[in-house]
Amino acid sequence: MKKLNRPRKLSFIEHRKAIQRLSRADDEAEVKRLLSSLWHQGGFEMNLERYNSGSKLWRVVDLPDQGRVVQDFSYPPKTEFCGIGRCNKAGQQVLYTSPNLGTCLSEMKGMAVGTQIRAGVWEAKSDFWCLNVSKHRNPVSKSGKLYSALQDLYDDIGDHHYLRTSVITDWFLGELSEDVSLNSELDGIQALRYPSTLRTTESDNFSNVVFHKNFVDSGGIKLSQWYHLEVSEAGETSCVVETKSLGFQSREGVSDDGNLVWSEGPRSSGAIIPPGATVKFTKNGENWIPDQPLETFS
């Protein structure tokens, strides 16, 4: 964990008012202006985390067929389907992931017996910095309290909040990453971690991680394993998910024509959930908790 503090030039009251204005801003230019002012005048204490190459994250696609190409596992999304989201502006391509498969399943609409889904494991191919706005601690410093107020924006539910959070995310991962003063301390910010809207515990595992287009397109993170899963048991408080087939990027997993290769056989060394294996999930509030460790990112 690295805390990046900016020398504060405004009074605490002035900063608090700026954050309040930011939480109400409904214009992209105004959001960017307020963010830039807060950054250059010392507005908040940033919680940054360094993750190593090899870190893995999950992405689930709620569609029944296996998936044929990498794009079928959420990246790059077709621009015509890129409506405004919590961390992307309309038409903007980003990669949404989660450290926890249970979080991905929790955000699906239903878990009925026979439901088939695609699950991809995305693996970082280089080290990267992640801005964490999912932590909810009791801040002590004034700059920490201001940062906490900024975090609260990512807890709000409803499309009308997305204008602010999508612009804020793009600003942190885009414009700010090109800031010379920032790059003197670290090599840009490639990802942002924010709380799942369905989180009912304080665990950071119930969070999502979004990656900027530049990092993904440059090969900073790639699809390394792909799964075809099926719900074999489902109830109000528990469910069981089984691997029907999977593939590996490192084992001739992509054919010459760019199609993914699937296997139902025993080649499972390195697989998080081998073929035929099952994982039971128990519900805690709105969150599905696996009965075995599946987290690959911490």
Report residues per predicted region:
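Beta-hairpin (beta-strand-turn-beta-strand) motif
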Residues: L63, P99-N100
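Active-site and NAD+-binding cores of ADP-ribose-processing enzymes
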Residues: K2-S53, R59-T79, N88, M111-S298
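A short, exposed loop/beta-hairpin motif centered on an aromatic-Gly-Thr core
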Residues: G91-T97
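N-terminal accessory/assembly segment that mediates macromolecular interactions
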Residues: G85-R86, V94, K109
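Short active-site loop/helix that positions an aromatic residue
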Residues: L101-A112
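DNA-binding interface regions
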Residues: C82-G83, K89, L101-G102
